[in-house]
Curated annotation (Swiss-Prot):
Matches recorded under Gene3D superfamilies: P-loop containing nucleotide triphosphate hydrolases, Signal recognition particle SRP54, nucleotide-binding domain, Signal recognition particle, SRP54 subunit, M-domain
Binding site for GTP: 106-113, 186-190, 244-247
Subcellular location: Cytoplasm
GO cellular component, one term: signal recognition particle
Domain remarks in the Swiss-Prot or TrEMBL record: Composed of three domains: the N-terminal N domain, which is responsible for interactions with the ribosome, the central G domain, which binds GTP, and the C-terminal M domain, which binds the RNA and the signal sequence of the RNC.
Organism: Pyrobaculum arsenaticum (strain DSM 13514 / JCM 11321 / PZ6)
Full protein name: Signal recognition particle 54 kDa protein
Any single biological process term in GO: SRP-dependent cotranslational protein targeting to membrane
Annotated Pfam families: SRP54, SRP54_N, SRP_SPB
Quaternary structure and interacting proteins, as annotated: Part of the signal recognition particle protein translocation system, which is composed of SRP and FtsY. Archaeal SRP consists of a 7S RNA molecule of 300 nucleotides and two protein subunits: SRP54 and SRP19.
Keyword field: Cytoplasm, GTP-binding, Hydrolase, Nucleotide-binding, Ribonucleoprotein, RNA-binding, Signal recognition particle
Domain of life: Archaea
């Protein structure tokens, strides 16, 4: 995802550099949006429709009070990208019967066999017993590859090293692994124009009657993903698409948009080679990360789960976070989990502005901060701006720490204060929708 994120981050930076949005500026931004989408290999017709919709909204819609036009433009860009990538509602993968049979398809080199193990691992972590069947009779290494992956994740496996009939192997696999909750059947990788192999997939489909058909697509094919999906759709229904190798190419955006255009639903993306590196695809969260907006929903859920007192929520949501509020919630902050994970959810690139050393310090020294805050007067807690060198020395002495410790805590406090202001701005946008 890094290449794709960098591509869109540059676009957002250019928009944020704009002081005033007149018609000429809007047209230049529109051209920049088009260039970015084309670099991501989004189909040309989708690029034109996307740009027309975004420009029309910017011309006609008035930003909410307190939101600069350039920030609202970024938010419009966010909403239109969500539509482009498949819409607001993420598609869920939920086995509904036992055994729930999943048939995996894909062209050669798409990462299909590895993805079958990733999907199995994903489901096993959620309590499902998963079995795996290899039906590839064309690629000799496929049997060994999937068997080794199955052993690695602890999944029952069925395959026939010297088997010749993929359809019969699939049938016997279903019969031999009856006790599982989910059965994943891997098929031979194929070129979409290879008629005989496509007929074989259809024969396996007819023989085992799968509950879900999953097409695995390599992100590097970009907009050609639509052609792959449509070719398979001529022979059997495609319920789910998994886009692999999203970590290695900027063309993944084009693949996502192209697949969404066909009506197929992307449910997962592969973000690395390890069996753990499969993520459920949520268009809204995916686009937020692309644009450097962070995962605000996840962050808000974490904060609200901890800050249960209404007046504290009001302080944070209003953008006012003083040291008294910080003191009240110092214990609750520890319930958020590792602060490094929390900061990753921050919007606007704030996470990058907080060093790893600061994050580690904040995790280790919450007790020290409580002592520092307890050494302050009520006036100092409510108005941190009055903390000069003399006051800091007195506070440090009372808390049994050094003045440097006090200053470091104040640095973390300032970063949290910035976070609360950002939350306030994003909440205004959400309320305006």
């Amino acid at each position: 995802m890094k290449a794709l994120t960098e591509l869109f981050s540059k676009l957002v930076e250019k928009i944020r550099d704009v002081e005033y949005i007149d018609e000429a500026t809007l047209q230049e931004i529109a051209r920049e949006i088009q260039r970015t989408l084309l670099k991501a290999d989004v189909p040309l017709d989708l690029v034109k429709t996307f740009t027309d919709n975004a420009v029309k909204r910017i011309r006609e819609e008035k930003p909410p009070a307190g939101i600069p036009p350039r920030e609202y433009l970024i938010y419009v860009l966010y909403e239109e990208l969500v539509k482009l990538m498949g819409g607001e509602q993420p598609a869920e993968f939920k086995p509904t019967k036992k055994p729930y049979i999943v048939l995996l398809l894909g062209v050669e080199g798409s990462g299909k066999t590895t993805t079958s193990a990733k999907l199995a691992r994903y489901l096993m972590k959620r309590g499902y017993k998963v079995g795996m069947v290899e039906t590839d009779t064309i690629r000799p290494a496929a049997f060994d590859q999937l068997r080794q992956l199955a052993e690695k994740i602890g999944a029952p496996f069925y395959g026939e090293r010297d088997g010749k009939d993929a359809v019969e192997i699939a049938r016997r696999g279903v019969a031999n692994l009856k006790g599982v909750d989910v059965l994943i059947i891997d098929t031979a990788g194929r070129h979409r124009n290879e008629e005989a192999l496509l007929q074989e997939v259809k024969a396996i489909y007819d023989a085992v009657n799968p509950d879900e058909v999953v097409l695995v697509v390599d992100a590097t094919v970009g907009k050609l993903a639509a052609a792959q999906a449509e070719a398979f759709m001529k022979y059997l229904p495609i319920h789910t698409v998994i886009i692999t190798k999203m970590d290695s190419t900027a063309r993944g955006g084009g693949a996502l948009a192209a697949v969404a255009k066909t009506g197929a639903r992307v449910k997962f993306i592969g973000v690395g080679e390890d069996v753990e590196e499969l993520e459920p695809f949520n268009p809204r969260k995916f686009v937020a990360r692309l644009l450097g907006m962070g995962d605000l929903d996840a962050l808000l859920e974490k904060i609200k789960a901890v800050f249960e007192e209404e007046e504290v929520l009001e302080e944070i949501e209003s953008g006012r976070l003083d040291l008294l509020t910080f003191k009240k919630q110092i214990d609750s902050l520890m319930k958020l989990g590792p602060l490094s994970k929390v900061f990753q959810l921050l919007p606007g690139g704030l996470a990058a502005k907080i060093s790893e050393e600061q994050i580690e310090l904040s995790q280790k020294n919450l007790k020290k901060w409580r002592a520092i805050l307890s050494s302050m007067t009520m006036e100092e807690l409510k108005n941190p701006d009055i903390l000069n060198a003399s006051r800091i020395r007195r506070i440090a002495l009372g808390a049994g720490v050094t003045p440097k410790d006090v200053k470091e805590m104040l640095t973390v406090y300032e970063n949290l204060k910035k976070m609360s202001k950002t939350l306030k701005r994003q909440m205004r946008l959400r309320m305006a929708r």
